[in-house]
């Protein structure tokens, strides 16, 4: 772990405030005056020339500089003239001094940039027509704006062998300009020291030295930060140009973080998914599953309603026939004979529609696949099941205790925040659970949940660390709550959090208790009053079961009576569809305007990027049509009316991009004392231990060939999925 060298590279950084990006400015209160092309600007001591220029709206060209990475200063494209200085300086690395007059467009600056650009293009293949970076390439843009109109280089160009670093990132290393952005991203953000440089001068190459897969859950981000076409997307190769695609701002549902994304589509098909800036959630990064699992949206899709015939086979039918059959069964059964299970990719609109439908047939047996303890405060207090500190709040914490979770694969962008704070703010991290590679050092306290009792009682050495902390966080993974002693684990963590608040120097508004969820629908379902887990259905098996996107395999045919009528509504023929008597095809997250609530309780919206395939429809519309045929018509016909209903049930569900602060931690702790469950000695083992467990976790990613290639590459090595380069 290269914590010390990286910190030396980032020397001069102040402690990162909440939600901000890396800056070289110090905490000094006295400002100094500098001039940019004669325009006065006040900046803090330590501000670089480039930052001072940006403060007045002057854009300086750059290739190696990136706001979230350490300064390398090796591309020299940002050269500017300082009045009375003998030579031009690199704007990204030079701190300003009082009274400087920075000349960004002087003849000297222009000639320096032209010279640098000429050197960069000397060995560049200039293969823009067949380069996937074409149209969004920094080298194209800056050579047009700052380069010369001709080259003096007449010798043969350098050629570099391409590297095979796995099934996601395609390399054409002849295009590489050695900006080292990918290397710095890998070591600083992803925490993986797989990439580096070998050789020097004309022989310098970027690669892995020994051919191997770039083993990171964030590897796709090096495609975005590469300023040229050296690193591009393998699945996207030669499929579309950026100006041909339609961009739709949306939300990711592959985990519970709720990363902001842009869905690029062409001719009704998702071509690629890119990150969208959101400082409080994902900054400008997304995980590989978010970025590359989109091909699963085209495979194993349910496109037409299906019913099981007399021979026990599922056959296609019309919407009228399918809905009539389901409505007839709904009219035959009432109350406890009817139950529903909601899966991990279901939106809030569908959840409230299904809840209203079952309530109208006198049933309240609405369950989620994911278990959450109901003993003690359970789900009655919102603070008991949220990441209360917020994702960006990690940057303010000084101690983090992780319990029964592997955030690197359960919530990669949350883990990246922890690593960022660990690098910049000297964050101390401890883990109770199976030892895993989190990309940062931590104190492993053991894997037994009984350690929680020792910490709560104050007998464990780590109790003193928590007591001395000013802003501690205790993060409990939702996977730990799936155990038989989940209620006892939750009660113990609640007790620790409350004791910290009472005995340490924690400020009044700082929240210690945090739950890290893994699936996108869980928080909204709990907000709407769904029962966590399917234990109620196992104890009292229904005669009609509605599976709304339930593909987790939490219940099987063997758990239900032989005459139980099962309806599956969803978008993939995965785990739930084969056991159903009727299948109603729904829309995936890229095909509907829908509300999702992330693990910190922040409501966000997806937008329609493409239309659902075949006869598939949005989930709430299917449920609304079903209610009308069944004679229990739901009182809404439009999306706005459904959201008005959401507001009636839980107002926070329509306060988009806003977090309603949760409270009542003391009351939750008092109620947790009523839990009489005992902690087990079994070790806390998160379900996603290694990167192989990360790629295929839901119906979309399980249908993705790209994710299957990743699993194969991790299992057998990158050579197993090597693809010859066309270029």
From Swiss-Prot:
User: Has keyword Membrane?
Assistant: yes
- Which keywords belong to this entry? 2Fe-2S, 4Fe-4S, Acetylation, Electron transport, Iron, Iron-sulfur, Membrane, Metal-binding, Mitochondrion, Mitochondrion inner membrane, NAD, Oxidoreductase, Respiratory chain, Transit peptide, Translocase, Transport, Ubiquinone
Listed InterPro entries: 2Fe-2S_ferredoxin-like_sf, 2Fe-2S_ferredoxin-type, Mopterin_OxRdtase, Mopterin_OxRdtase_4Fe-4S_dom, NADH_UbQ_OxRdtase_75kDa_su_CS, NADH_UbQ_OxRdtase_ferredoxin, NADH_UbQ_OxRdtase_Gsu, NADH_UbQ_OxRdtase_Gsu_4Fe4S-bd
Instruction: Tell me the Gene Ontology biological-process terms attached to this UniProt entry.
Output: cellular respiration; mitochondrial electron transport, NADH to ubiquinone; mitochondrial respiratory chain complex I assembly
> What compartments host this protein?
Mitochondrion inner membrane
Transit peptide, residue positions per record: 1-23
User: How is the cofactor bound, as the UniProt entry phrases it?
Assistant: Binds 1 [2Fe-2S] cluster per subunit. Binds 2 [4Fe-4S] clusters per subunit.
Catalytic activity, reaction form: a ubiquinone + NADH + 5 H(+)(in) = a ubiquinol + NAD(+) + 4 H(+)(out)
The secretion signal range is none
List every position bearing N6-acetyllysine: 84, 467, 499, 709
Protein name per the record: NADH-ubiquinone oxidoreductase 75 kDa subunit, mitochondrial
Q: Which gene encodes it?
A: NDUFS1
């Amino acid at each position: 772990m290269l914590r010390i060298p990286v910190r030396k590279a980032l020397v001069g950084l102040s402690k990162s405030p909440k939600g901000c990006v890396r800056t070289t400015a110090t905490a000094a209160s006295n400002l100094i005056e500098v001039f940019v092309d004669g325009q006065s600007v006040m900046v803090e001591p330590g501000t670089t020339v480039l930052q001072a220029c940006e403060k007045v709206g002057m854009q300086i060209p750059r290739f190696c500089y990136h706001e979230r990475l350490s300064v390398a200063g090796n591309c020299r494209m940002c050269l500017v003239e300082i009045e009375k200085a003998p030579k031009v300086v690199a704007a990204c690395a030079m701190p300003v001094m009082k009274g400087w007059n920075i000349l960004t467009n002087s003849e000297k600056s222009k000639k320096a940039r032209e010279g640098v650009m000429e050197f960069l293009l000397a060995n560049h293949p200039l293969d823009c027509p067949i380069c996937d970076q074409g149209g969004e390439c920094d080298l194209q843009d800056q050579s047009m704006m700052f380069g010369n109109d001709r080259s003096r280089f007449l010798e043969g160009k350098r050629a570099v062998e391409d590297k095979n670093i796995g099934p996601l990132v395609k390399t054409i290393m002849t295009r590489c300009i050695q900006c080292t952005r990918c290397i710095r991203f890998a070591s600083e953000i992803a925490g993986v020291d797989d990439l580096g440089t070998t050789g020097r001068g004309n022989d310098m190459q970027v690669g892995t030295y020994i051919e191997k897969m770039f083993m990171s859950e964030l590897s796709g981000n090096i495609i975005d930060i590469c300023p040229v076409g050296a690193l591009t997307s393998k699945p996207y190769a030669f499929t579309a140009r950026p100006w041909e695609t339609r961009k739709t701002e949306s939300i990711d549902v592959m985990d519970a973080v709720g990363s902001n994304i842009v869905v690029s589509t062409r001719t009704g098909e998702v071509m690629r998914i890119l990150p969208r800036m959101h400082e409080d959630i994902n900054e400008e990064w997304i995980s590989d599953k978010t970025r590359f699992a989109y091909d699963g949206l085209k495979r194993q899709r349910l496109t037409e309603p299906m019913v099981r015939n007399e021979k026990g086979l599922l056959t296609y039918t019309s919407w009228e026939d399918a809905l009539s059959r389901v409505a007839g069964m709904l009219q035959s059964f009432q109350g406890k004979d009817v139950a529903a299970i909601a899966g991990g990719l279901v939106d809030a609109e569908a959840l409230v529609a299904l809840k209203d439908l079952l309530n109208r047939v006198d049933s309240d047996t609405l369950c989620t696949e994911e278990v959450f303890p109901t003993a003690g405060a359970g789900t009655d207090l919102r603070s008991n099941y949220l990441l209360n500190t917020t994702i960006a709040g990690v940057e303010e914490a000084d101690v983090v205790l992780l319990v029964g979770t592997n955030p690197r694969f359960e919530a990669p962008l949350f883990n990246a925040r922890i690593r960022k704070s660990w690098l910049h703010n000297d964050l101390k991290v401890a883990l109770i659970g199976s030892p895993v590679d989190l990309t940062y050092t931590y104190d492993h306290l053991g894997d037994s949940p009984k350690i929680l009792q020792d910490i709560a009682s104050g007998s464990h050495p780590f109790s003193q660390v928590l007591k001395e902390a000013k802003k501690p966080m205790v993060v409990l993974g939702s996977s730990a709550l799936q155990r038989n002693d989940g209620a006892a684990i939750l009660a113990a963590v609640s007790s620790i959090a409350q004791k910290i608040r009472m005995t340490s120097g924690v400020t009044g508004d700082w929240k210690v208790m945090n739950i890290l969820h893994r699936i996108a629908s869980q928080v909204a379902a709990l907000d709407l009053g769904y029962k966590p887990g399917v234990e109620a259905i196992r104890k009292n098996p229904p005669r009609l079961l509605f599976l709304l996107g339930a593909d987790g395999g939490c219940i099987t045919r063997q758990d239900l009576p032989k005459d139980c009528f099962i309806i599956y509504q969803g978008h993939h023929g995965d785990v739930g569809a084969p056991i159903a008597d009727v299948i109603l095809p729904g829309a995936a997250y890229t095909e509907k305007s829908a509300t999702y609530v992330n693990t910190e309780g922040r409501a966000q919206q997806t937008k329609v990027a493409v239309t659902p395939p075949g006869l598939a429809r949005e989930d709430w519309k299917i449920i609304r049509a079903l209610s009308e045929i069944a004679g229990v018509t739901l009182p809404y016909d439009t999306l706005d009316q459904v959201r008005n209903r959401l507001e009636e049930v839980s107002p926070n569900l329509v306060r988009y991009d806003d977090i309603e602060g949760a409270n009542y931690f003391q009351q939750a702790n008092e109620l947790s004392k009523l839990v009489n469950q005992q902690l087990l000695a079994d070790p806390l083992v998160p379900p996603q231990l290694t990167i192989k467990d990360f790629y295929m976790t839901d119906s979309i990613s399980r249908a993705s060939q790209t994710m299957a290639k990743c699993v194969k590459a991790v299992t057998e090595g990158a050579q197993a999925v090597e693809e010859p380069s066309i270029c």
